[in-house]
Amino acid sequence: MSDSVFIYAFTRYGWVEECIDIDEVAYVDFEKSQICLKAHDAQIPRMIQTTSVDLYNVEKALLRNRR
């Protein structure tokens, strides 16, 4: 069973709450404050601009899933 995390993503409409599946996260970039999701059918992976608190929450969930 995969974990999901709620984050606040910055879009052209402002801050939007979004639920992402941890299994879909490729990596977390703390310098750019972005979460990069895996690209399956798309050629370009999706980058989500978010807050530092959400970056740490996603990182904790990724580490928890490794165990």
Question: Which residues does each predicted region cover?
Answer:
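Acidic, Ser/Thr- and proline-rich intrinsically disordered linker/docking segments
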Residues: 2-18, 24-67
